[in-house]
């Protein structure tokens, strides 16, 4: 039997400590990250206690009669303690569903945490989704990641890009100044897709100030001009490329290849995984960008799916 409590800001410290010690949480679930856009979502995060001990948390919000975990994050799902058992997890979902139903909610949409982000195996939730909730997969997105210790050889075109950028005098530097790169990124997204970055420059500067070791910018520079950059989200198991962009000149010179050479082959070579992120156009995972997927495969990347589940209460 679980005691289910709604999250409130006065327990942010307890929430954050739990996420940091959990077997599958990342800094995206820290309230310092989640709450930067709290004005856009009606928070409905849940905390699950048994015998006075916090055993799981669910980052979530509501819209209409639906609970989402979480539309404002790359992934959501149940964040679990190391000691949470499969039987407890199944009980948790039964009781959570009863609780949500009693509150007048009718549906749950659940973005599972991809397995590469787990510090320990943590798919008890997926078993419960199927056998307790009768959940269905309603979206399957496609991304690319590298198992770094596998040492897959880069394709020749990627290796040539590294050499070309070096010969052109491009250097790579880690920077705390996001403004120049954000202009490159914003111009590219606006020209190519007619969209803006998910985060504004001000938001990214705020998040970097809160998580300086987790949110890291690498820039490719020549003669003092930023030609491209990559923003990394660094979690215990995975280094994830949150944003990657280059100017027209930067693309011609191969600066993205040079940036990835520094990041993947040197600075973060000892990490378990590097995640390039998604290569699709639509929210349900359709519209595969074949050229983008091919580029990522050229660095030794291979496929991973990001699944979204749904069930009726």
Task: Say what each PLM segment does.
Residues 41-43, 102-105, 215, 269-271:
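Short, high-confidence coil segments that cap the C-terminus of an alpha-helix
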Residues 49, 57-60, 73, 79-81, ...:
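Aromatic (often tryptophan-rich) hydrophobic motifs at membrane interfaces
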Residues 65-77:
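Conserved acyl-donor/pantetheine-binding loop and adjacent beta-alpha core of acyl/acetyltransferases
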Residues 99, 105, 134-136:
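Conserved alpha/beta cores of soluble small-molecule-handling proteins
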Residues 112-115, 278-279:
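Short, well-ordered beta-to-alpha junction loops that form the rim of enzyme active sites
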């Amino acid at each position: 039997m679980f005691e289910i409590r709604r999250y409130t800001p006065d327990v942010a410290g307890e929430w954050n400590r739990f996420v940091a010690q959990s077997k599958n949480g990342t800094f995206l679930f820290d309230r310092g990250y989640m709450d930067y856009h709290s004005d856009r979502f009606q928070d409905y995060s849940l905390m699950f206690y048994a015998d006075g001990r916090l055993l799981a948390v669910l980052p979530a919000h509501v819209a209409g009669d639906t609970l989402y975990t979480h539309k404002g994050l790359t992934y959501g799902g149940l964040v679990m303690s190391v000691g949470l058992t499969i039987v407890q997890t199944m009980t948790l979902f039964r009781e959570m569903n009863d609780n949500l139903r009693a509150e007048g909610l009718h549906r749950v949409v659940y973005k599972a945490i991809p397995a590469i982000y787990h510090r320990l195996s943590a798919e008890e939730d997926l078993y419960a989704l199927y056998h307790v909730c009768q959940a269905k997969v309603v979206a399957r997105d496609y991304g690319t990641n590298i198992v770094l210790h596998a040492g897959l050889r880069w394709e020749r075109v990627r290796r040539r890009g590294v050499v070309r950028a070096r010969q052109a005098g491009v250097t790579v530097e880690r920077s705390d100044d996001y403004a120049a790169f954000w202009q490159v990124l914003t111009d590219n997204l606006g020209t190519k897709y007619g969209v803006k970055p998910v985060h504004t420059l001000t938001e990214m500067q705020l998040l970097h100030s809160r998580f300086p070791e987790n949110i890291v910018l690498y820039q490719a520079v020549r003669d003092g001009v930023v030609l491209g950059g990559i923003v990394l989200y660094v979690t215990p198991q995975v280094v994830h490329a949150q944003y990657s962009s280059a100017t027209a000149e930067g693309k011609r010179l191969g600066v993205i290849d040079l940036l990835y050479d520094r990041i993947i082959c040197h600075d973060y070579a000892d990490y378990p995984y590097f995640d390039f992120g998604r290569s699709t156009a639509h929210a349900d995972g359709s519209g595969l960008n074949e050229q983008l997927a091919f580029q990522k495969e050229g660095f030794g990347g291979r496929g991973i799916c990001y699944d979204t589940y749904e069930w009726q209460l």
